[in-house]
């Protein structure tokens, strides 16, 4: 059974690599201060690790 992870975008993707923006869009984070709840899977954890400097993660 997978737990959920709440992810909030706290920094903008402007000026970052296009791959960073692609990861954020894939997670459903398009604007600052937007939060989404995702399943805690290895794939999602990998996406979070790639852009962890822009996010706030709550277990």
Swiss-Prot record:
Molecular function GO terms recorded: structural constituent of ribosome
UniProt xrefs under CDD domains: Ribosomal_L30
GO CC terms, sorted: cytosolic large ribosomal subunit
SUPFAM superfamilies hit by this protein: Ribosomal protein L30p/L7e (SSF55129)
InterPro entries (UniProt xref): Ribo_uL30_ferredoxin-like_sf, Ribosomal_uL30_bac-type, Ribosomal_uL30_ferredoxin-like
Membrane-spanning intervals of the chain: none
UniProt keywords, alphabetically: Ribonucleoprotein, Ribosomal protein
Gene3D superfamilies named among the record's database cross-references: Ribosomal protein L30, ferredoxin-like fold domain
UniProt record, GO biological process: translation
Similarity section: Belongs to the universal ribosomal protein uL30 family.
NCBIfam families: rpmD_bact
Subunit description: Part of the 50S ribosomal subunit.
The name this protein goes by in its record: Large ribosomal subunit protein uL30
Provenance organism: Geotalea uraniireducens (strain Rf4) (Geobacter uraniireducens)
């Amino acid at each position: 059974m997978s737990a959920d992870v709440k992810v909030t975008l706290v920094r903008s993707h402007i000026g970052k690599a296009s791959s960073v923006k692609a990861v954020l869009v894939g997670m459903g984070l398009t604007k600052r201060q937007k939060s989404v709840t995702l399943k805690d899977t290895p794939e999602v954890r990998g996406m979070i690790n790639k852009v962890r400097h822009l996010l706030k993660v709550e277990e």
